[in-house]
């Protein structure tokens, strides 16, 4: 697809995708506050509504805020302070969500690490950010203790998958999974940790939301060595605020089933902060087995879900769903990986045959932009595309290795301009400068390294 010089139209100027957005959403200022403050502002009038669900136990927004404040007080009691980085090695549990907002409240940062990593890998990530506090799941304790050797870790906070279960379920879990860990004197269990916070201040420690990194998440290293990506409060709030344009699909009172892990930007920004700031209930599935996804969908009937393409391909072939009415589904979104046109067609045919109004939603982004930069949701979609840029995001293509923008329709390197662009790579200024560049137009762009083009309607197509 090509455009002659005299007809050249540039995406960064024309922004053809804006025709799909209601004018009331365009150009609205971003919340100038922390992630915790934004969460509270959005829900302070709805405290009795459910915020989280964990194996049948429901946690209201009132309880969520109480637990966040208790966690913040406990962090202060064990010495975590403004500017510190605590490393977390865990799947998603309510405690990890409390820890995220509590760390943000006191001006600290969470370094989120995949619990499947080796001892050496976990050790390297602890050392990289010089953590003095390590938070880990009880089932990863042995490896984490080994990983913490020869680091500056002073305390280890252990979270059990049973900590937020109802009493009968907690008893059943402990009978089936007896804790055989040998805990050293520097280890504190979650309930003892919370008790230690009694009497400590729960006041917020002021930070600059444009500068304070609420998390460090790690790239996979597929295009070089793994890097710690610092994402700020403003980055997370930018993702959440931009998805308010999809309120016709996702709104207060609905359920989002969270099947993504906390150690990727997609899992926390889209799977936790976004739905909670929209007033949804987040049903937490800590270890989502794709083979069991169909039964989970039938059990919880979530209107929304963020996953990867294989999740939906699995659903489309699940015999348990063969004759089921799935009309409760509003937006099941696939990101994190590409999906072929044929596979997309199969999933959409399955959804339509089961009374789902809209096709599978899609998105494109990367860790460096806090997960998402584009979305195809509801009726706004084209086969094979990654959707249109989010309402406050600009996506265009450039001559590879340069800042020369190419016209709409021409293929080049995809670059992204958004308030969700990372603060930078942790202690890697040269790598940051190579990816995060100020162009002649004065805007800051992330160079993705991906090849693609934008069509005349503003839809982004990734790949040749």
Protein language model regions, located:
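Conserved AMP-binding/adenylate-forming core of the ANL superfamily
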Residues: 48-93, 97-101, 118-123, 127, ...
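Conserved AMP-binding A3 loop
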Residues: 60-62, 214-241, 376
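Conserved structural elements of the adenylate-forming
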Residues: 65-70, 210, 229-249, 259, ...
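Structural core segment of the AMP-binding/adenylate-forming
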Residues: 78, 105-195
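Conserved pre-ATP/AMP-binding loop-to-beta segment of ANL
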Residues: 180-218, 225, 248-255
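Conserved AMP-binding/adenylation subdomain of ANL enzymes
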Residues: 237-255, 263-306, 314, 318-319
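Gly/Ser/Thr-rich phosphate-binding loop
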Residues: 303-307, 316-383, 394
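Conserved ATP-binding/catalytic segment of the ANL
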Residues: 404, 415-464
């Amino acid at each position: 697809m090509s455009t002659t010089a005299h007809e050249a139209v540039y995406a960064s100027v024309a922004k053809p995708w804006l025709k799909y957005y209601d004018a009331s959403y365009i150009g609205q200022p971003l919340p100038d506050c922390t992630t915790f403050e934004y969460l509270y502002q959005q829900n302070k009038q709805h405290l009795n509504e459910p915020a989280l669900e964990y194996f049948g136990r429901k946690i209201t927004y009132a309880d969520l805020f109480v637990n966040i404040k208790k966690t913040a007080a406990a962090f202060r009691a064990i010495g975590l302070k403004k500017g510190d980085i605590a490393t977390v090695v865990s799947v998603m549990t309510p405690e990890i969500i409390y820890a995220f907002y509590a760390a943000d409240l006191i001006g600290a940062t969470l370094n989120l690490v995949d619990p499947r990593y080796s001892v050496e890998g976990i050790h390297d990530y602890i050392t990289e950010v010089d953590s003095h506090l390590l938070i880990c799941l009880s089932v990863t304790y042995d490896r984490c203790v080994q990983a913490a050797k020869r680091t500056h870790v002073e305390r280890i906070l252990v979270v059990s998958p049973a900590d937020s279960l109802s009493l009968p379920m907690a008893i059943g879990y402990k009978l089936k999974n007896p804790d055989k860990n040998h805990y050293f004197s520097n280890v504190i269990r979650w309930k003892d940790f919370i008790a230690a916070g009694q009497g400590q201040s729960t006041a917020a420690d002021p930070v600059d939301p444009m500068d304070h990194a609420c998390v460090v998440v790690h790239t996979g290293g597929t295009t070089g060595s793994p890097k710690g990506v610092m994402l700020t409060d403003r980055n997370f709030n930018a993702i959440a605020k931009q998805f308010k344009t999809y309120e016709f699909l996702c709104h207060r009172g609905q359920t989002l089933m969270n099947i993504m892990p906390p150690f990727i930007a997609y899992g926390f920004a889209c799977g936790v902060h976004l739905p909670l700031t929209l007033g949804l209930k987040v049903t937490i599935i800590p270890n989502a087995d794709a083979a069991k996804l169909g039964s989970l969908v039938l059990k919880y009937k979530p209107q929304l879900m963020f996953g990867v393409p294989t999740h939906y391909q699995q659903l489309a072939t699940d015999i348990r769903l063969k004759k089921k009415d799935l009309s409760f589904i509003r937006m099941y979104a696939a990101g994190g990986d590409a999906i072929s046109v044929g596979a997309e067609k199969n999933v959409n045919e399955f959804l339509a045959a089961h009374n789902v109004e809209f096709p599978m939603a899609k998105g494109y982004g990367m860790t460096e932009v806090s997960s998402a930069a584009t979305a195809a949701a509801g009726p706004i979609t084209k086969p094979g595309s990654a959707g249109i840029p989010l309402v406050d995001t600009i996506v265009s293509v450039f001559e590879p290795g340069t800042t020369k923008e190419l016209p709409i329709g021409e293929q080049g390197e995809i670059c992204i301009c958004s308030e969700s662009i990372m603060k930078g790579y942790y202690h890697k200024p040269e790598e940051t400068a190579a990816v995060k560049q100020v162009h002649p137009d004065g805007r800051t762009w992330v160079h993705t390294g991906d090849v693609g083009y934008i069509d005349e309607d503003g839809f982004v197509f990734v790949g040749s």
